[in-house]
A protein has these predicted regions:
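Intrinsically disordered, low-complexity Ser/Thr/Pro/Gly-rich regulatory segments
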Residues: 1-67, 72-271
């Protein structure tokens, strides 16, 4: 298939770019360069409606995430703050998820990545379902008709490492977090990809099949990916994004709030 061929060819070209990043002596510069490599790999294959940028995410109740390597956001319909800057600020309602990029995914770096992903996944927002055709368009149902009710806007959380720890140790860290008392399992990463030695870790349901983001899962499974690690990263991302929906905040309620505040500040009666 031509798409898969193109993905594999593009992935092969990333090896030279990763080697170029080794010319940076400052680890922060090297890490930022490698984040851009992943963006440059994904960008040509993703529709323009999906934006990719580093930044932070905030919710309507005042909570805010950590700084995230790559935020996947709605680049067409949703509000984004400081869009012209290299790092943006995103309302929780405007994003699909995030990718944490690590040059070397040690266990300590995995813990940090889990923390960053959790800082997004714990942000509250209105639930979207199949009736949300666009962030601001909801399919109307007539009297007596029912629809929707499914959960279509979980936050997607992916960790990618160019090199990394063994798959058993990565699964061990995730398994320990999964078994901790009081932990919200849905705040854990959905997928972990490591290009060298080449594997994917995924949420696994009780019947052994992969779980979609937001779905129930019992443990973490894995498969060896070999040279197809980056190709599988893109295909996984594309498959998940195709099932997600967004729902904008209640702008009408915000309008009424600001309208009333303006009237009150002017000393006018508000009915």
């Amino acid at each position: 298939m031509r798409l898969l061929d193109a993905l594999r060819i593009e992935a092969e070209g990333l090896v030279a770019k990763v080697q170029q990043s080794n010319l940076f002596s400052h680890m922060g510069d090297r890490g930022e360069f490698r984040e851009q490599i992943i963006q440059q790999f994904l960008r040509p294959f993703l529709p323009p409606c999906y934006g990719l940028s580093p930044g932070e995410v905030f919710s309507s109740d005042g909570e805010q995430s950590a700084q995230v390597d790559i935020v996947i956001y709605d680049a067409v319909f949703s509000t984004v703050l400081f869009r012209s800057n290299t790092r943006m600020l995103f309302p929780a309602e405007s994003i699909f998820g995030s990718i944490e990029v690590k040059s070397s995914l040690s266990l300590s770096e995995l813990e940090k990545a889990c923390g960053n992903i959790e800082s997004i996944k714990r942000l509250t927002r209105r639930q979207a379902d199949a009736m949300d055709l666009l962030p601001f368009v909801r399919f109307p149902l007539g009297p007596g008709l029912r629809g929707g009710g499914d959960f279509r806007n979980p936050y997607l959380g992916i960790v990618f490492g160019y090199k990394g720890a063994t798959v058993d140790s990565v699964r061990g860290v995730l398994g320990d977090r999964l078994s901790e008392s009081g932990v919200n399992r849905h705040c854990l990463p959905d997928f972990v990809f490591v290009a060298d030695p080449g594997y994917m870790v995924y949420r696994r349901q009780q019947d052994g099949t992969p779980a979609y983001p937001g779905g129930d899962f019992s443990t973490y499974g894995w498969i060896p990916t070999g040279a197809d690690n980056l190709a599988l990263l893109f295909l996984t991302l594309n498959s998940c994004l195709g099932n997600l929906r967004l729902r904008r905040p209640d702008v009408n309620a915000l309008w009424i709030q600001v309208f009333r505040e303006c009237c009150q500040q002017a000393g006018w009666m508000v009915t």
